[in-house]
């Protein structure tokens, strides 16, 4: 086995360690709450009615939390469609060229009919040498997944998966339901935590689980609250984690709110128009992940045309293919109008959650 293949296998194996840790904590919390608290402590003290109410509410939060977590982990990241790949002849010409200017000319012609409005910082076509494709707007190469991810937000070790266009809604719901889960557990355990702490209750075995359950749920609540608040702010601004650290550069300059259409429309881009699906971990996000409306809509007829097509693309339900609009109908006048591309600049993907040093997004004149 080649060293690089062995190393990648080790990476994939180690990547499941954080997921197994979270799974262990969740399974233990289920046992501690259901068995030690509700069955032994509450029922043992004649509080059967309260135990039933607690169990019903607990399982509601537990099911939604596990469902969202599962979807975040096992939803495959969406990658660019074949329209963004170079043809065999274009790829052959590109590989034979030693001049970066000539390579960029080949990429520019290939990207002319694609709905692309972003470039690298040096005004070059964003091309992934590893995947051998032209990157759509907001797409980036993830070194951990070894593929280009549509609307990549970050690679999250706690789910061992890339968070992007296909599962960003699931990730937000995972944070939301984990927050509610921890809050519910902490608030309902608190009074028994006090009783065990003051030795009013003397069950030694249940005491350990109840005391530890309160500390763990409170700790995770504080941690998840800060992370969820940050991502809610990102959704309201229509930014990814990558874009929050490096604002996209448009034809008029750097603008961190370049993709923002207003708070309401920004939220609907992630959660969709159907309110009945908002709190369910099923795919309902707007668009196809390959093109996104910007604040240029209304002033640039070409951009408006692309945006209208993107708005009409919907997919509801998990594990369904994402509809791709006919790219040939969306000629990119921005790329076509630029007569010359500057020297190519490199661009890296993101390999970990919360990093700030990988991506530049820009739009050419």
Swiss-Prot record:
Organism of derivation: Bos taurus (Bovine)
This protein's name: Palmitoyltransferase ZDHHC20
The DHHC domain, residue ranges: 126-176
InterPro entries: Palmitoyltrfase_DHHC (IPR001594), PFA4/ZDH16/20/ERF2-like (IPR039859)
Broad class of where this protein is predominantly found: Golgi
Gene that encodes it: ZDHHC20
Family recorded in the similarity comment: Belongs to the DHHC palmitoyltransferase family.
Amino-acid positions noted as binding Zn(2+) 2 in the UniProt annotation, renumbered to this chain: 142, 145, 155, 162
Domain comment, as recorded: The DHHC domain is required for palmitoyltransferase activity.
Residues the entry annotates as binding substrate: 135, 140-143
Ranges facing Lumenal side: 36-53, 191-207
Gene Ontology molecular function, alphabetical: protein-cysteine S-myristoyltransferase activity; protein-cysteine S-palmitoyltransferase activity; protein-cysteine S-stearoyltransferase activity; zinc ion binding
UniProt modified residues of type Phosphoserine: 305, 330
Reactions it catalyzes: L-cysteinyl-[protein] + hexadecanoyl-CoA = S-hexadecanoyl-L-cysteinyl-[protein] + CoA; L-cysteinyl-[protein] + tetradecanoyl-CoA = S-tetradecanoyl-L-cysteinyl-[protein] + CoA; L-cysteinyl-[protein] + octadecanoyl-CoA = S-octadecanoyl-L-cysteinyl-[protein] + CoA
Regions annotated as coiled coil: none
Record keywords: Acyltransferase, Cell membrane, Cytoplasm, Endoplasmic reticulum, Golgi apparatus, Lipoprotein, Membrane, Metal-binding, Palmitate, Phosphoprotein, Transferase, Transmembrane, Transmembrane helix, Zinc
Region of interest called Disordered, as start-end residue ranges on this chain: 301-365
Binding-site residues, Zn(2+) 1: 128, 131, 141, 148
Known function: Palmitoyltransferase that could catalyze the addition of palmitate onto various protein substrates. Catalyzes palmitoylation of Cys residues in the cytoplasmic C-terminus of EGFR, and modulates the duration of EGFR signaling by modulating palmitoylation-dependent EGFR internalization and degradation. Has a preference for acyl-CoA with C16 fatty acid chains. Can also utilize acyl-CoA with C14 and C18 fatty acid chains. May palmitoylate CALHM1 subunit of gustatory voltage-gated ion channels and modulate channel gating and kinetics.
Localisation per UniProt entry: Golgi apparatus membrane; Cell membrane; Cytoplasm, Perinuclear region; Endoplasmic reticulum membrane
């Amino acid at each position: 086995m080649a060293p690089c293949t062995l190393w990648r296998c080790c990476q994939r194996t180690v990547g499941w360690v954080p997921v197994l840790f979270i799974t262990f904590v969740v399974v233990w919390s289920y046992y501690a709450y259901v068995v030690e608290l509700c069955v032994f402590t509450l029922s043992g003290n004649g509080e059967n009615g309260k135990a039933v109410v607690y169990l019903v509410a607990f399982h509601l939060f537990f099911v939604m939390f596990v469902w969202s977590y599962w979807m975040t982990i096992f939803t495959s990241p969406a990658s660019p469609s074949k329209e963004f790949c170079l043809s065999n002849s274009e790829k052959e010409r590109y590989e034979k060229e030693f001049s970066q200017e000539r390579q960029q000319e080949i990429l520019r012609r290939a990207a002319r009919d694609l709905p692309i409005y972003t470039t690298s910082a040096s005004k070059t076509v964003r091309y992934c040498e590893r995947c051998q494709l032209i990157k759509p707007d907001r797409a980036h190469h993830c070194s951990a997944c070894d593929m280009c991810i549509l609307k990549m937000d970050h690679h999250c070790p706690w789910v061992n998966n890339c968070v992007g266009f296909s599962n960003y809604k699931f990730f937000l719901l995972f944070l939301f339901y984990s927050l509610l889960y921890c809050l519910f557990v902490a608030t309902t355990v608190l009074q028994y935590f006090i009783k065990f702490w003051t030795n009013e209750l003397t069950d030694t075995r249940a005491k350990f689980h109840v005391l530890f359950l309160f500390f763990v749920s409170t700790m995770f609540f504080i941690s998840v609250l800060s992370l969820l608040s940050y991502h809610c702010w990102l959704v309201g601004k229509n930014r990814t984690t990558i874009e929050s650290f490096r604002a996209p550069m448009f034809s008029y300059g750097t603008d961190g709110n370049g993709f923002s259409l207003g708070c309401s429309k920004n939220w609907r881009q992630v959660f969709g128009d159907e309110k009945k699906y908002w709190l369910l971990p099923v795919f309902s996000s707007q668009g196809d992940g390959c093109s996104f409306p910007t604040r240029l809509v209304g002033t640039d007829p070409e951009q408006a045309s692309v945006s209208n097509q993107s708005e009409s693309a919907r997919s509801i339900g998990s594990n369904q293919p994402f509809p791709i609009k006919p790219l040939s109908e969306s000629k990119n006048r921005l790329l076509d109008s630029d007569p010359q591309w500057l020297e190519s600049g490199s661009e890296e993907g993101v390999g970990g959650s919360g990093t700030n040093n990988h991506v530049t997004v820009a739009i050419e004149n």
